[in-house]
UniProtKB/Swiss-Prot annotation:
Disulfide pairings: C26-C120, C28-C44, C43-C99, C49-C127, C50-C92, C59-C85, C78-C90
Protein's cellular compartments: Secreted
Main location: secreted
Function: Major protein of the aragonitic otoconia. It is unlikely that this protein has phospholipase A2 activity.
Keywords, comma-separated and alphabetical: Disulfide bond, Glycoprotein, Secreted
Protein name (record): Phospholipase A2 homolog otoconin-22
Length: 127
């Protein structure tokens, strides 16, 4: 669920939550067009692709719950899933949260609410 993804982000980045990434660049949040603006935006593009694959399998990223734990160095990992959808959605969120952690130095306040500036145009990269 988005609430669980928010927890993952808070654990991995320490200072940020889902709100900091919900309208960042051209691919974080509801907007999915144009080229990603930086490595964090690429994290979101990858998560979008992952969610699309899960949705094509009948899974719902908004309602699917899952369990995860925190490893050393603030890395999150999914726990053993009870079904395919739980596994797929958790892994999508796990990869994105760990990607945010890895690319946190790239976070640029300029790219918050960026899509509202009309800068995200053109085709999006393939998955």
């Amino acid at each position: 669920t988005p609430a669980q993804f928010d927890e993952m982000i808070k654990v991995t980045t320490i200072i940020y939550g889902l709100a900091n990434f919900s309208d960042y660049g051209c691919h974080c949040g509801l907007n999915n067009q144009g080229m990603p603006v930086d490595d964090i935006d690429w994290c979101c593009h990858s998560q979008d692709c992952c969610y699309n694959k899960a949705e094509m399998s009948g899974c719902n990223p908004v309602t699917q719950t899952y369990r995860f734990y925190v490893e050393e160095q603030k890395k999150v990992e999914c726990m053993k899933a009870s079904n395919r959808c739980e596994k797929m959605i958790c892994e999508c969120d796990e990869k994105a949260a760990n990607c945010f952690r890895k690319e946190l130095e790239d976070y640029n306040i300029y790219f918050r609410n960026f899509s509202s500036l009309g800068a995200c145009r053109g085709p999006r990269p393939f998955c």
